[in-house]
Amino acid sequence: MERTAKRRKTKICMVVPNAAVKGGIASVVNGYRGSALEKRFQICYVESYCDGSRWQKFGKAVAGYGAFIRQLPLQRPDVVHIHSSFGPSFYRKMPFIYLSRLFRIPVVNHIHGAEFDAFYTQASGSKRKLVDMVYRQCDRLLVLSEEWKKRMARIVPADKITVLENYCLIPAVPFDRGRDGRQVLFVGELGRRKGCYDMPAIWERVTAKVPQARLVMAGDGEMEPVRQGFARSGLLEHVTFPGWVRGQGKVRLFAESAVFLFPTYNEGMPMVVLEAMSYGLGIVTTTVGGIPGLIQDGTSGRLCRPGDVEGMAEAVIRLLEEDAVREAYGGTARKNAVQHYSLERHLEKLGRVYESVARKGRRA
């Protein structure tokens, strides 16, 4: 009897942040760990970034480069999958890209960043040439939305760019119980990019119409300046700052809140909006990045221009006062999350990218 040869799994070396890092990239990668992706492919994770002091970050980067250099000749991965962003992350990932090219291993560069204009469009000619050169070394770019594909197509051919939307884990929660119909939630890094300095003006208008409304500002960053903005408006009694939340603390906030307010100025495809969709919250956010692909204005939430304090306040007030509208928006948003943004759908698409890139690499 002939013995059927067992097919070798495609080997993936994935360059990732430490699992405890705050932010969207780590959230995406943490969903891969222990998932069906690890059954389908042989995956090795190389951590290249951590939170902490400058020296801790430097030490993690050096250790990451060392681990990667050992992986390439010993394990000979079929594909290197790099998670990157703009700014410092771009420069930290350059050695991984060029080392992969040195060993003739194809590179998938998964770009999570949001500030393309500041990093590339407004950069000097020499910096743009460097960015062009680095991205053209990659065999495939993964971007978060069709809008980002159009932007990156200025640099590399469109057929080398694949849209891979972020995903959300769909909770099985009883949405009709335990939800505070007056609680509004923000989750993210506290600062200017996320629109946090617009929050006091928005909230002043909201509490003038709905005095019982409460705002939870969950996140770290520029907490004290943001808090002072609320204090100057006499609004601190209506606002709580629990700090950065994760795990069950984050689940609890999403499950008990009624409205998700995210007045951001710049995004790729924010994980927190997907999470709010999965929990069926009434969502008020802005028309930036990949958000219009997630939220249909007047159907699954409300979209406003960044900085439109009046518009966002009016939208929040309506969702707090009209339960039926809020529940209709939330129900549609959750349905969209289930149908289009599940982890399973995301992993299936990523798996097809791996197989396509690996095949081309073997033929090269």
Language model: regions and residue ranges:
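Donor nucleotide-sugar binding/catalytic pocket of nucleotide-sugar-dependent glycosyltransferases
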Residues: 130-173
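Conserved acidic donor-binding segment of nucleotide-sugar-dependent glycosyltransferases
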Residues: 297-298, 302-309, 318-323
